[in-house]
Amino acid sequence: IAQCLVGSEMCIRDSFYTAMYHLLIHPNIIQDVNGEYPMMESLKVGHTTGNRYTVFSLWDTYRNVSTLMTLLYPEKQLDIIRTMIDMYKESGWLPKWELYGRETLTMEGDPSIPYIVDAYMRGLRDYDIETAYEGMRKGATTPGEFNLLRPDNNDYMSKGYVPLREQYDNSVSHALEYYIADWNLSLLADALGKKEDAKLFRERAMGYKHYYCKEFGTLRPILPDGTFYSPFDPKQGENFEPSPGFHEGNAWNYTFYVPHDIKGLAKLMGGQKRFVDKLQMVFDKGYYDMANEPDIAYPYLFSYFKGEAWRTQKLVRELLGKYYHNAPNGLPGNDDTGTMSTWAIFSMMGFYPACPGDLDYVVTSPTFNKVTIRLDEKFYPKGELVIESARKTPEDIYIKEVTAGGKKLKGYTISQDELVNAGTLRFTLENKH
C-alpha cells in the first residue's frame, strides 16, 4: 500500500488507502508452503518455485486493474500473467473467471486478451508471449461449439456480430467484449509481426457498427435475419432487470462501450456535438451506473473532444464524492476484486486508462495536493513520480494547465512513457472552465 503516498486530507486519504487495500486482496497466492497447487481443471497437483495466483475476475479487472498493477506492482503483475499462461498450458484455455483452479465461465467475453496485452504494450514482457498469443488466437478463431470462451463465435466470425437468438442471451454484451478483445489482439499481433492476423482482428473490432440504431441513437440487438429486435426500449434493464441483448444493464450502459473507436462512434452518432450531448444526457437523466463495469469510463470520454474535458473533471469529482466514503456504504457496489476501487485510485491521482491496450491516460484534476508514487526502478528507471496540484480553494477543480517533467501537455492525455519518465506531474487548477 505504501507504493503511493498521498496528502493529509484525512477522510479522502483513508478512502484512498482503503481502495489500495481492496486492489491487493485478489488475485491471491494459492500455492502451499512447498510450492504445490491445484492444477487448472484437473485433479493433479502442480508445483511452482514462484507465485501461483487464483481468483481471476477478468471481465472486471481487465478494464483498469491490469494497468494499475503494471504501474505499481510490476513484479506481482508478471507472476499473475505467468499464472494465466500456465492455466492455458494446463487446461487448453486462457482463464475467463477462474476460482481456485476451476473455470466458472461467469460473465462473457475473452478478457485474458486485453488484460495481458495492456501489460505487454506498456513494456511488461518477461513471460512467454508466443504461448500467450497461441492461447488468445485459439479463443478468437475456434468455432463456437468447441469454444469455451466464445460459444457464439460462429455467428461472430461469419456475420461480424452476435445475433439475438434467445430473449435474454446477452448477445450485444458478448459482441462488445469480443470487439475490445480483438482490437487488443490486433495490437499484439502487430507488435509480434503477425500482419495478416493484425488486419483480421482490427477489422473484426469495428463490427460494433452493425448494432448502431439511428432511430434510438443507441446500440440495439439484431435478430438472425439481420433486422433489429422489436419492440425495443433502450432503458429496459435498469436495476438489473432482464434485458434483451444486454447483461446486467441496458442499452445506455453499453452504447458508449467502444473504447477503441470513440471517434468512430461519434461519427455514427452524427458528430462531436451529438455524441457529447447524448453522453451528458446519460448522466443528467440518471442512466449512468457507477456500479456497472461497461460504463465506468464514461466520464472520461468527454476529454477526447476539444473543449469538453471540463465535463470529465466535474463529473469525476462529483462521482468520487457521491460513491466513495470511509464507511460501510463507501463503495458503489460489489468491488469486483478491486475494479471499483481502482477507478477511485486513478481518479484521485488525476489520470485514468479509458481504453485497455491504449497507452494514453486521460487526465483529470487530482483530489490531493500531492501524491508520490514509488515506481520500481527495475522497470521504471526514473524511480518516482510526484503529482502536484496548485489550487487556491477546494472549488478549483478545473484544469488550467498540466506539465509533465516541466513540459506542458498539449491536450488532456498523457502517454505511459511520458507518465513514468516525468518525475513530476504538475496540475494548475482553477474554479472555472
Predicted regions and their residues:
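Single conserved hydrophobic/aromatic residue that forms the stacking wall/gate
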Residues: 1-7, 12
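Active-site core of glycosidic bond-cleaving carbohydrate-active enzymes
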Residues: 48-63, 71-73, 113, 123-381, ...
